[in-house]
């Protein structure tokens, strides 16, 4: 033990104890030379950092070289941005320390992007930082493993220790820092030059101001510029022609063409919208061959009911953005690079959606999703969009998981959907279902023994295993579709269902791999029991529900009516300009289209359909455990004693257990459904007063809970 302490003491002395050292004249001449030509060295270091970051992002030295060759000016512009950041060192005496921090900053961002791209197609952007707390709170998923967490913590810890040592023992600039002089003026000039040079670079097509394909944009214009644009380019730009007169002109054009709604919340059909996570028809992939059709139900519905391609805004990840377009009718192309509106504008602004439109005519509106309620800030977003209820996994009694153990199976969503219908017997329902069963990561090692569906056309063994896993999970999704439509067929209620893939799976697919020629195209299918004619059409995600409601005689809402009347216009530019104008007006403008009022306020979202209650509490025979009995408990049910959470064990949907030492006679017990970050989604309908059998009570106190 003494030897260990001696070694640690030596390390401490070497790294963290400052000792005066007399340097040679040659050392000081070298330092003077570096200071004199520091701008040149900064330029060289900046280019080196950008090149290294591109190697990490592309995971290929050759690809990084091709980027420099094919997009030399973009590479130089990325280097300029890093060079400007290095100019900050002139404000400090510990310039070596400042240079290491700046170098570490860009390198760490590049490493994170490389890690992200190893698991999905969409590169790392600023908005992803807002998802980190939710990712860290999610256990047993491919988003963030314990191994990744350990590597991140150890790596950042080591870097922090190195910075401390450098701060203590590193060199310090001894010359005069002219804070109010030339240095500060030079720094100001450099930073002022950024928007000017950016504008020039965009106007000369050195870089782009908008990425129709964010993954391709990062490839073409570099990580540093692209990530920086996600930081500063958020929200919507105000259209040049935005004013009350132009908004009213668009509204008048729509009003002159729109039809009248012919149903209401009692006579209208139930509408179900199903997001099929990462769903892709294997027949659409040119190289992939499957031994037999894994999605026969999907293909049968595609053949007999309205269907088509669906243009979505993301590939490989970003479910929330496809969801946003589909529910609101608004387009992601007008937002900043890589932005998630759920994490930005919808944090403070309510937003018209299909839910609020249908609520106006008496529909009950629901969301059912077997993943965490807080992920993508969905609980907040669904409230802002006007939904009545949201049943997330915390409100479900989930027992079955996918073969890789990461995600709940989707079969539970059928019964949970039926609950939404049964809860409102006198109303028509709009229920939005979000599946997760086909979610990545797709294991590159064999996971399923003797899989029913096997693939060929894939040479790499790891990718062959991944595709095998994926197509077998597609079959599970297909079974879910059949179970859902079969169950709906049993009900004597008019119903229409629309199902769609939110994006292609994270499998590195390219445009050339797809029969459609576009990795931003998925498919949608429909089902109905109303005898509606088959009308195939290729749509954008933001047009899907406008088209669906149009077929059943529902013509409600500013945006939905806009699409219903204008989406078939031969003037595509005018159609997009009008959408841009209305979208800005609703989210960022003065809401001229609502006459300046808040027509669609946020709802008081109720989490779950089933009520949670406590029916009895009793001690175990051993006296060391207390059992809480009730209804509709889940794995996310937590016991609170006098409003403070205590450790509890889930035993069944009707029984929870706590330690006897955590409760005292007369304490008040409640059961809460708890999400990530200890968010309480729902409390038990009643509180229960604990009566300790070891304490004498009068008869009145013993009957308080009856």
Predicted regions and their residues:
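Transmembrane and membrane-interface helices of multi-pass
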Residues: 2-217, 666
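Serine-centered coil/turn micro-motif
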Residues: 14-15, 25, 222, 353, ...
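Solvent-exposed soluble domains appended to multi-pass membrane proteins
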Residues: 259-265, 273-276, 281-706
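Short alpha-helical interface patches
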Residues: 120, 129-140, 149, 225-234, ...
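Membrane-interface segments at or immediately adjacent to transmembrane helices
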Residues: 194-273
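Alpha-helix initiation and N-capping motif
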Residues: 129-132, 220-224, 247, 295, ...
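Short, well-ordered coil↔helix boundary/capping segments
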Residues: 99-102, 126-129, 221-226, 468-478, ...
């Amino acid at each position: 033990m003494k030897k260990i302490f001696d070694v640690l003491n030596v390390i401490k002395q070497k790294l963290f104890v400052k000792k005066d050292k007399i340097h040679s004249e040659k050392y000081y001449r070298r330092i003077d030379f570096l200071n004199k030509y520091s701008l040149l060295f900064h330029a060289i270091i900046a280019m080196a950092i950008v090149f290294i970051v591109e190697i990490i992002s592309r995971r290929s030295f050759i690809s990084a070289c091709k980027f420099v060759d094919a997009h030399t000016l973009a590479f130089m512009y990325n280097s300029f941005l890093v060079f400007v950041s290095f100019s900050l060192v002139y404000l400090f005496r510990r310039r070596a320390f400042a240079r290491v921090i700046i170098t570490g900053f860009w390198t760490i961002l590049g490493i994170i992007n490389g890690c992200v791209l190893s698991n999905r197609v969409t590169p790392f952007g600023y908005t992803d930082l807002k998802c980190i707390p939710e990712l860290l709170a999610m256990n047993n998923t491919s988003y963030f493993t314990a191994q990744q967490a350990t590597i991140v913590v150890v790596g950042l810890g080591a870097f922090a220790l190195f910075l401390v040592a450098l701060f203590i023992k590193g060199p310090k600039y001894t010359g005069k820092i002219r804070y109010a002089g030339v240095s500060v003026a030079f720094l100001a000039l450099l930073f002022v030059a950024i928007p000017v040079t950016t504008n020039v670079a965009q106007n000369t097509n050195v870089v782009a101001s908008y990425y129709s394909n964010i993954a391709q944009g990062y490839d073409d214009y570099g990580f540093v510029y692209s990530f920086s644009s996600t930081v500063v380019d958020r929200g919507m730009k105000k259209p040049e022609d935005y004013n009350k007169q132009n908004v009213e002109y668009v509204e008048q054009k729509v009003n002159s063409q729109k039809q009248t709604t012919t149903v209401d919340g009692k006579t209208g059909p139930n509408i179900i919208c199903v997001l099929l996570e990462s769903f892709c028809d294997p027949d659409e992939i040119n190289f992939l061959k499957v031994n037999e059709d894994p999605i026969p139900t999907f293909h049968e519905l595609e053949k007999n009911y309205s269907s088509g391609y669906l243009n979505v805004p993301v590939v490989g990840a970003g479910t929330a953005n496809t969801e946003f377009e589909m529910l609101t009718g608004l387009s992601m192309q007008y937002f900043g690079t890589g932005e998630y509106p759920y994490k930005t504008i919808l944090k403070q602004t309510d937003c018209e959606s299909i839910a609020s439109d249908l609520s106006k005519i008496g529909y009950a509106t629901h969301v059912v999703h077997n993943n965490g309620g807080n992920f993508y800030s969905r609980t907040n977003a669904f409230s802002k969009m006007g939904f009545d209820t949201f049943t997330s996994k915390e409100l479900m009694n989930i027992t079955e998981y996918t073969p890789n153990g990461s995600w709940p199976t989707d079969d539970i969503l059928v019964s949970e959907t039926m609950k939404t219908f049964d809860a409102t017997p006198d109303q028509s329902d709009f229920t939005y279902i979000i599946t997760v069963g086909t979610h990545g990561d797709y294991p590159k090692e064999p996971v399923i023994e003797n899989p029913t569906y096997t693939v060929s056309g894939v040479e790499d063994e790891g990718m062959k295993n991944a595709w095998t896993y994926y197509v077998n999970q597609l079959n599970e999704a297909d079974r879910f579709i059949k179970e859902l439509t079969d169950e709906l067929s049993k009900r004597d209620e008019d119903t229409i269902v629309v199902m769609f893939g939110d994006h292609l799976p994270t499998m590195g697919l390219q445009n050339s791999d797809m029969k459609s020629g576009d990795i931003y195209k998925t498919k949608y299918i429909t089902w109905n029991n109303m005898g509606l004619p088959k009308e195939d059409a290729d749509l954008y995600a933001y047009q899907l529900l406008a088209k669906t409601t149009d077929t059943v005689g529902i013509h409600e809402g500013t945006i939905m009516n806009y699409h219903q009347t204008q989406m078939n216009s031969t003037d595509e530019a005018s159609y997009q300009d009008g959408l841009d104008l209305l979208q800005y007006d609703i989210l960022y403008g003065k809401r001229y289209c609502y006459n300046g009022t808040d027509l669609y306020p946020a709802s008081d979202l109720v989490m779950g359909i089933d009520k949670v209650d406590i029916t009895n509490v009793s001690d175990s025979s051993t006296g060391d455990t207390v059992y809480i009995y009730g209804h509709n408990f889940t794995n996310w049910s937590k016991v609170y004693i006098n409003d403070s959470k205590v450790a509890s064990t889930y035993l069944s949907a009707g029984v929870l257990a706590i330690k006897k030492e955590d409760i005292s006679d007369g304490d008040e017990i409640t059961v809460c459904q708890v999400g990530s970050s200890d968010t309480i989604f729902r409390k038990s309908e009643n509180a229960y007063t604990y009566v300790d059998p070891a304490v004498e009570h009068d008869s009145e106190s013993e009957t308080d809970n009856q």
